[in-house]
Amino acid sequence: MKIILTHEVSGLGAAGDVVDVKDGYARNYLIPRKFAIRWTKGGEKDVEQIRRARKIHEIQTIEQANQVKAQLEGVKVRLAVRSGDAGRLFGSVTPADVASAIKAAGGPEVDKRRIELGSPIKTLGAHETSVRLHPEVDAKVSIEVVAA
């Protein structure tokens, strides 16, 4: 089945790409989660609109990515969350929490889908995360999780 990706999907492509996937994968996973829409002849207009929107928000060059990387690595990110007595969090820290903490700390605005936690953050203390700015540039961000 031909689909148009509306979001970046690991292993398939970026938003605006037209890809061919198995019917079940499209119907049961991609389309219900709004990662893709069905390809139609009229969908070509949607592809151009998605590509234009992506171009505005995307970091275009490696130089831009390196500038954002320098800004990110210079920011001290501190995240206050509720926790129990043993230092375990109620829930976990999400990429959206990290993105808002980076912005609150004076860093650049980062898309939550670009933040890779590795494993869920469920304890207090210092943690390392990676932000994928460009296919060739990753920024390491250290986050200090403290009790609220």
Curated annotation (Swiss-Prot):
Descriptive protein name: Large ribosomal subunit protein bL9
Species classification: Bacteria, Bacillati, Actinomycetota, Actinomycetes, Kitasatosporales
GO biological-process terms attached to the record: translation
GO molecular function: rRNA binding; structural constituent of ribosome
UniProt xrefs under Pfam families: Ribosomal_L9_C (PF03948), Ribosomal_L9_N (PF01281)
Keyword Ribonucleoprotein attributed: yes
One GO cellular component term noted in the UniProt record for this chain: cytosolic large ribosomal subunit
Entry's family note: Belongs to the bacterial ribosomal protein bL9 family.
Transmembrane segments: none
